Amino acid sequence: MAGQKIRIRLKAYDHEAIDASAKKIVETVTRTGARVVGPVPLPTEKNVYCVIRSPHKDKDSREHFEMRTHKRLIDILDPTPKTVDALMRIDLPASVDVNIQ
């Protein structure tokens, strides 16, 4: 697989879980002999939701909730078949969304 590249995008709401997953992927890939670029932190997506506190009146009293989505990008250069096999077997938390291109 010379000259090829695998791009992995990680998404999670918890920054500690995504950093631990990225570290685990980088360690696994370097152990198999491929080169790694990253993890590159991508901009955090912040969604803010405004909710009225009272169920029936007092519209001026509102509460704000926010949800942050953290993202990381990892590029694997010149992957070997051993690297691809190791990536398929790696165990990551369910809270981390992995997209492999």
Swiss-Prot record:
The keyword Ribonucleoprotein applies. GO terms for biological process: translation. The gene is rpsJ. Belongs to the universal ribosomal protein uS10 family. This is Small ribosomal subunit protein uS10. SMART domains: Ribosomal_S10. PROSITE patterns: RIBOSOMAL_S10 (PS00361). It holds the Pfam family Ribosomal_S10.
